[in-house]
């Protein structure tokens, strides 16, 4: 379920949401970098003289969305529709402080295959950023599990443009040949993950993981064309389940493999 803002406030909502997401993300990264070493000094890792867990990863998977009303409006006007399951590509970083608390940040982009329509190219995509908090569990020295909750913001973008076949005279006859529509929302993520560490436990070796959960959308804005609000737009959001494969430690693993051959 998601909610729309009032018309009086929604004209500036996508931009403010995206600015808030960026500020939240970068502020969180700075907070993690600044505070986690101090917190970790009192944790088990500090007692053992070890550095805290700190890793980055890339992720690819699928993310469900709520595009029903948007697809209905596109279909009613003769345009192609899009699958509600979009390709998700992104990455993130996390740090484990005090031995158990996981602090993370991630960015994900959502993509759908572009569609052709009467000499036009119709594209749907989006993206969002999240700051997350989780609890670190180690069933075995190489296996990690972690429930997480995150907050952030993001937006969807619908672009209708030329497919590359237009001539100069076509543009003169119809200069308004493209349009980019956007909408934004605040997001809450609830999920969990698993990660397996290859090589030395707690080292920098290859790590394979799986993350899944559900993304909730709140305070969705009206659609915008450039800087202008569009009234009467259909509901659309990134709300839905997600599942992603994560890979980390590739550079370290390749470095170890190269060193072993020398």
Residue ranges and their predicted role:
Residues 127, 139-141, 146, 152, ...:
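Mid-length scaffold segments of soluble, non-membrane domains
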Residues 1-52, 253-262:
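Cleavable N-terminal export/targeting peptides
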Residues 65-83, 106-129, 154-187, 217-242:
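Extracellular/periplasm-exposed beta-strand and loop segments of Gram-negative cell-envelope proteins
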Residues 91-97, 105, 131-135, 149-153, ...:
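Residues on the lipid-exposed face of transmembrane beta-strands in outer-membrane beta-barrel proteins
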Residues 50-56, 97-101, 141-147, 184-186, ...:
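Outer-envelope beta-barrel architecture signal
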Residues 29, 82, 122, 136-138, ...:
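Residues embedded in well-ordered secondary-structure elements
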Residues 195-262:
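Predominantly the C-terminal beta-signal and adjacent terminal strand-loop region
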Residues 37-98, 248-253, 261-262:
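Short glycine/proline- and aromatic-enriched beta-strand/turn motifs that initiate or cap beta-hairpins
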